Amino acid sequence: MGIPKFFRYISERWPMILQLIEGTQIPEFDNLYLDMNSILHNCTHGNDDDVTKRLTEEEVFAKICTYIDHLFQTIKPKKIFYMAIDGVAPRAKMNQQRARRFRTAMDAEKALKKAIENGDEIPKGEPFDSNSITPGTEFMAKLTKNLQYFIHDKISNDSKWREVQIIFSGHEVPGEGEHKIMNFIRHLKSQKDFNQNTRHCIYGLDADLIMLGLSTHGPHFALLREEVTFGRRNSEKKSLEHQNFYLLHLSLLREYMELEFKEIADEMQFEYNFERILDDFILVMFVIGNDFLPNLPDLHLNKGAFPVLLQTFKEALLHTDGYINEHGKINLKRLGVWLNYLSQFELLNFEKDDIDVEWFNKQLENISLEGERKRQRVGKKLLVKQQKKLIGSIKPWLMEQLQEKLSPDLPDEEIPTLELPKDLDMKDHLEFLKEFAFDLGLFITHSKSKGSYSLKMDLDSINPDETEEEFQNRVNSIRKTIKKYQNAIIVEDKEELETEKTIYNERFERWKHEYYHDKLKFTTDSEEKVRDLAKDYVEGLQWVLYYYYRGCPSWSWYYPHHYAPRISDLAKGLDQDIEFDLSKPFTPFQQLMAVLPERSKNLIPPAFRPLMYDEQSPIHDFYPAEVQLDKNGKTADWEAVVLISFVDEKRLIEAMQPYLRKLSPEEKTRNQFGKDLIYSFNPQVDNLYKSPLGGIFSDIEHNHCVEKEYITIPLDSSEIRYGLLPNAKLGAEMLAGFPTLLSLPFTSSLEYNETMVFQQPSKQQSMVLQITDIYKTNNVTLEDFSKRHLNKVIYTRWPYLRESKLVSLTDGKTIYEYQESNDKKKFGFITKPAETQDKKLFNSLKNSMLRMYAKQKAVKIGPMEAIATVFPVTGLVRDSDGGYIKTFSPTPDYYPLQLVVESVVNEDERYKERGPIPIEEEFPLNSKVIFLGDYAYGGETTIDGYSSDRRLKITVEKKFLDSEPTIGKERLQMDHQAVKYYPSYIVSKNMHLHPLFLSKITSKFMITDATGKHINVGIPVKFEARHQKVLGYARRNPRGWEYSNLTLNLLKEYRQTFPDFFFRLSKVGNDIPVLEDLFPDTSTKDAMNLLDGIKQWLKYVSSKFIAVSLESDSLTKTSIAAVEDHIMKYAANIEGHERKQLAKVPREAVLNPRSSFALLRSQKFDLGDRVVYIQDSGKVPIFSKGTVVGYTTLSSSLSIQVLFDHEIVAGNNFGGRLRTNRGLGLDASFLLNITNRQFIYHSKASKKALEKKKQSNNRNNNTKTAHKTPSKQQSEEKLRKERAHDLLNFIKKDTNEKNSESVDNKSMGSQKDSKPAKKVLLKRPAQKSSENVQVDLANFEKAPLDNPTVAGSIFNAVANQYSDGIGSNLNIPTPPHPMNVVGGPIPGANDVADVGLPYNIPPGFMTHPNGLHPLHPHQMPYPNMNGMSIPPPAPHGFGQPISFPPPPPMTNVSDQGSRIVVNEKESQDLKKFINGKQHSNGSTIGGETKNSRKGEIKPSSGTNSTECQSPKSQSNAADRDNKKDEST
C-alpha cells in the first residue's frame, strides 16, 4: 500500500482524524507499542541521498536510544511498554524485502558515483549500509545488546520506566515487528480479565498499521507518527525535540467511516453491523496492494481507486446475503459478488485505454459503460424499435386509468389490467418491461393457463390518504417518465446490439491479452495459466486476512508473481478450498542470503560470501548485478515493481548446508532464534551492568533491573475474541481525552470541498459536517448561557474536547462577562455594550473561524451568532494548604458558541481538583525533592521525617562552591558586541532602498521565469505570516523588523554580484514580475542563465539559515564552545558538598518533581542562565545542572537548549557545536532556573537579611542623590534640548532642505515611568564637527506586548538581550566559493573570519580561549546554530547594460570616536525629515536615491531601543506586502 498516499488520502477525506501533540493535551494511554524498525529507519536513513554525510554505529545506537526515550516521555504509558524489532519475516514478505534491498544497494552505488563525479569529498571508511537492518547481521546483534543495556539503565534510574511492564522482542524472535505487536494485543484481548476500554497507542510509519489497528475494534486506539509533509522535501532535518508528532485517532476514523455506510443501513437484506462492515472494509483494501500482494491492475490511490472501492463495496452489500469477512475467513461466494461490481471499474478503464478511442466511442456507444453514463447525464434511454412501439400501445390505456383516483380498497378483479400481445417475445423484452412497469407504478402478472403476460396497477404503492394535489403530482410524474421512454435513442433491432457487444468483448479480450503478454509473458489463450494466477491471488487474499486476524498461517507461502490478474478474471480463482501448511521460518542467515544483494555481502558471515559472487555457485543466479524496474502505473520511483527472481527455498538451503560448519561460535549464536524478554524493577537487586559501548555509555554501577523470558502460548482460532467487546465505551461515553464527533449534533455529506489538511487543497471528496446549533434550537439565550457557565468549566476544541474556563461571551453587540470585586454589588455576572474595537475583533474572529473550520476541518458551523472567550486548563498547582487547584492559561482562546460542549460523561482525572493529602503521602520518607530556600536554591533534598502534620524534616545538599559559573553571561555580552541590529528604515536609508523593496527582498520576492514557474529571488531572513525569523540575521520587536550587520552584508553582496538584476527588481511594482519583461532585450537563454546563477547563489546563502520563532535566540557557536570548555573544567574541580539538616520546613519551601509541571512552565529564561533538571524521569538524571545556550518556542511550549555540566546518555553535541554529548533541548517544565530564582521561599531569617540589604542600598542611593543640585539638573535638561535642536537644524542645513516647522514634543507620547532615560549614540559627520549633542530619550513611547504569556516573556528576553555597546565592523570577509556555484573561487577567499554560530564573528572578536580549531557547520538540534558564511559573488553571464554605481560605504560603528546622544522626545522632526528625504529627493537609480547624502547606520538596542522610526505608513505597508507575498 502506498504509505504516504493512503495516509494523505484518508486524512483529506476525513479531515479531523489527526491531532498535533502539544504538551500534555493528549489522552492518557495504558499501553505503548513501538514498531522499532520505523525508529531504525529514522535514525539511520536521515541522509540517504547524501553520501558525504555518514553516521557511525555508535552514533546510530545513541540516536535510537534517545528516540525511544522521547517517544516514551511523549506518551507516558501507564501499564505496558512493548518494543518489537523485525525478526525473520514470512516468505510472503521476504520477496518484497529482497526487492527493496536490491534497489537500496543500487541507489547507494549510483549516489556514490554521482558524488565522485561532482567532486564531492567522500569521508573515509565504509558508509553505513542500511541493509544491515536485517535480522542476523552483526549490527542487529549489537543493537540488541545496546537496547538491553538501555532498558536496564532506564529501569534502574527512571521512575516512570519502573512503573510499567517492559517487554522487548528483538531481531532474534521471528516475525515482523507490527505483527508481533498484533499477536500481543490478540493475547491480551483474549484474556478473561481484559479491560475492553484499554487505551492503546502504536508508533509506526506503515499504513498497514491503520488496518491492523482497525482490526482490533478497540475504540481507544491511536497511531503515533511524525509530522508528514508533502511536496518538496526539506534538506534540513529537524532535531528530535523540535519534531512535530501527530496522533491518528482510530475512534474518529471509525466514526467517519460509519457516516460513509449509514446511507445503506436500511436497504441491506441482512442485519446492519458496523463492526462487521469494518472487517469487510479491511479485506477490500487489500486489493490496492500491501507488503504481500501487488495491487489489482489500475487500482491506484492517486487515480481515484479509494472511492471506487467504497462505492462498489456498498453496492455489493445491498446485493448479497451476508458479510464477506467471517472472523478472518473469506466467504468466496460473497467475495465474487463484490468482484462483479468492481469489474465495472475495469471496463471503464478499458474504454479509456483502447487505442482507437474516437472510433470506440462512436461505434460502441450503445453498449459501452461510458455511453450509458452519457445517456444518464442527459436523461436518455436506449430502446429497440419494438420496445418503443410497445410503449406507444401502453400509453393510452395508462392515461385513461389516471383520469380519476382509484380506491385502494378495490377488489383484485376490479384493478385495471392490460393484457400484453401474445406474439411479444417476452424472453427478449421481459427485463425491459419490468423496469418500465416499476417506473410507472405497475407490475407484471403471468397467467400460465393462458400463457399471457399483463400489466396491472400497483395500488399498494399509492398513499391511501393521497390528496388531490399529490394525485396530480403523481400523474405529472408518470407523464414525464413516459415521455423519457418515447424520446429514447432507438436501435433497429436486438441483433444490432448483439453485434456491437461482440465487437466490444473481442476488443476487451485483446486488451487483457496485451496485459498478460507484457507483464506475465503468457496470454489469455492460456486459460489454465490465467486460472492459476487468479487462484494464487485469491489464496493470497486469504493468507493476508488470516495474518491480520489469527496470526501467520504459513511461514513458507508466498505469491509467486510480480503482477496481479485482471479484475474480471479474478472470479476464476474463487472455486477452490484454501488450506495452508504452517511450516517454519527461515533461520536468520537463510533470510540474509535470500534478501541481500551481492553489494551487501559484507553483512553476511564470510563463509557464505562465495555463494554470492562465485560464478560456480549453485545459487549465483539469485544475485544479479542489475534489476529491471517497472512503474506499472505508479508515479514515484520507489513504487516501481522490482523485477527480480524469486528465491527457490530448497536450492538455497542445500547450497548453504556445507558451509554451516565453518561458522564461528558467535555466528552460530546469531543464527539461532530467541525469546521475548520482560523487564522489571527490583530494589533488592544491586549489581554492576557492563556497558556494551564503553566510549559512549558508562557502566551501570547500581543495576536494579531483572530480565526474564516472556513466553506466550499460541492461541487457537476458537480462543480469539473478535470484534468489539461488550461494554466498550463509544461516542460521547469514551474515556477522557479521546475525541469523538458525537458530542455535538450534525449532518454529513461528501463534497468536493478543497479541504486543506496539508500544504495544498485536496482534489478529492471530503466528509463535510454541518453543525446543528443546539442552543439556538433549544432557544437558549446568551444571557441564560452566561449566567449558567461564566467563570465555570466548559469544554471546547471539539472534537478534541478540553476543559476551559468561560470568561466572556459576545454577539458583537453586547459582552457578557464575569467580574471579580471585593464590592459585592460589583461581583458576578455583568453585561456591557461592545465598543468599536470589540466589534472589529468579533467580525475578524467570525470570518477567520468560518473560513478555518470550512477549509481545514471540512466543518460548516452555520451562522455564528456568538463567540466564547475561554482560558484553557493547563494543569494543577499546589496551594499553601497542600491542596491542588486548576490553573488556566492566561492566553485566551476563541470558539463559536455552537461548538461549545457544556459537560462530558468522563472527566479527565488529571485535572480534578483535590484537597490536601497527608504530608507523609505527598512527601514519602526518604523521597527526593527540590529545595527552594535561599541557602541552596534548587538543591537536592531528602525527606527525613515530619515536624508536624504540615512541616517537614529535611536534609539539604549544597556544593562547596559559593556561586554558579557565569561564563554563559560573559559570553552573551561578547555576542552582543559582535552582532548589531538596525531598524528597517535605517537600513533602507543607508542602502538607498525603498522600504517596500527592502521588506520583499529580505523575505519572499517572487518572479516568473521563462517556463511560467514562480521563483523566489529574495533572501529569506524574515517570515511575517509564519511568525519566524532567521537566527542572527533579523528580529522583530513591537515596532517593526530589524536587520543585523550580516543581512546588510548579504544585501550589499547581492547588489554587487548581480547589479543589473537588483536594479531592475527594485523598480517593479506589487505584481509578480516576469523574467522576460525584466530583460526584454536579452535572449531567453541568457536570462535563464542569469536566474540560474542567482538561484545557486541564494541557495548557498540560505543553506545554513535557521528559521526559528520570533521568540527564539541562541549563543554563537564560538561562545557555546567556550562555555563547554569552561564547564568541563568547572565540573572536574567541584570538591564535594555539605549537608544541612532542617526542621519545621513548610511544604512551600520544597518542590515535588512529580507535580510541578504547571508551575515550572511559567518560568522565564535567558541565555547564560544556570538551570537544574528536577524530574525523576526522562533523558537526564535528576539534579543535573547546566547552562542555557538557546531557547525557542514550540507551539505553546518553550524548549530550552541546555549545555549540561556532565555528559548524558541521551545527550548530543548540538550538531557539532560541542565536543562532547552534553547538549539537550528540554521543555521548560523540566527545569528550574537557579540564576533567576522565581520561586524562592524566604524564611524569617532570610527575610531579615534581605531587608537589611535593601535598607543599605537605599541609604547609598540617597547619599548619591543628595549631592545633585536642582539647578544642575535643570541646566543639563536645557543643554540636552538645545543640542537636539542644533542637531536637527544642522542636518536640515546640510541637505539644503530648510524647514521652520518646530519639533512636536507630543508626537512620541510621554513616558510616565520614573526609570532613567535610555541613551542611544549617534555620530555627527566628522568633516562638520566633532561636538557631541545629547538628547534625552525619557519620553519614548513603548508599544505594549499583546500577550502576557510565556512566549511574550521570552520575546522580551530575546529583544532586550542586545544592550548598548560598541558596534562591530560591518565588512565581513567572504568565504571560499563552493565548487558547484557559477563564478568559481575568488582571490583572497581563504581569509575568512572564524565561523560563528549561527553567524560569522567579525574581525577582532574573541575566539575560543584555548585556540580550538575552527568548528565546521553540522546538522544540529533546533535551533540550528550552523556557521553561516557570506557567499562569494557569481557572474550573471552577460554584459551589464546599465552603469550601476557602487553602493556607499557603510559607517564603521566600532570606529566612532565622539558620540551623539539623541533625545527621542525631541527627534520627531528628524523622523519626518528622513521620511521626506526618502520620497522627495528625486528618482532612484539601481536602488540608490539621487542627490541623497551617504547615510549612517546606528545600532538598535533590542526591544526598548530608542532609534528613530520611519512613519508607520511605510513600515506597515512593507509588512503588509511581505505578509501578502508569504501567503502567495
Swiss-Prot record:
Residues found modified as Phosphothreonine: T1506
Segments of skewed composition (Basic and acidic residues): 1274-1304, 1518-1528
Enzyme type, top EC level: hydrolase
EC number(s) stated in the UniProt entry for this protein: 3.1.13.-
Record's subcellular location: Cytoplasm; Cytoplasm, Perinuclear region; Cytoplasm, P-body
GO term, biological process aspect, one: mRNA destabilization
Effects seen without this gene: Mutations affect nuclear fusion, lead to reduced chromosome stability and defects in spindle pole body duplication and/or separation as well as loss of viability under conditions of nitrogen starvation. Homozygous diploids are unable to sporulate. Mutations also lead to arrest in pachytene and deficiency in meiotic recombination and sensitivity to oleate.
One Pfam family per UniProt: XRN1_D1
Note: Present with 11700 molecules/cell in log phase SD medium.
Job of this protein: Multifunctional protein that exhibits several independent functions at different levels of the cellular processes. 5'-3' exonuclease component of the nonsense-mediated mRNA decay (NMD) which is a highly conserved mRNA degradation pathway, an RNA surveillance system whose role is to identify and rid cells of mRNA with premature termination codons and thus prevents accumulation of potentially harmful truncated proteins. The NMD pathway has a second role regulating the decay of wild-type mRNAs, and especially mRNAs that are important for telomere functions.
Record's protein name: 5'-3' exoribonuclease 1
Species for this entry: Saccharomyces cerevisiae (strain ATCC 204508 / S288c)
Gene: XRN1
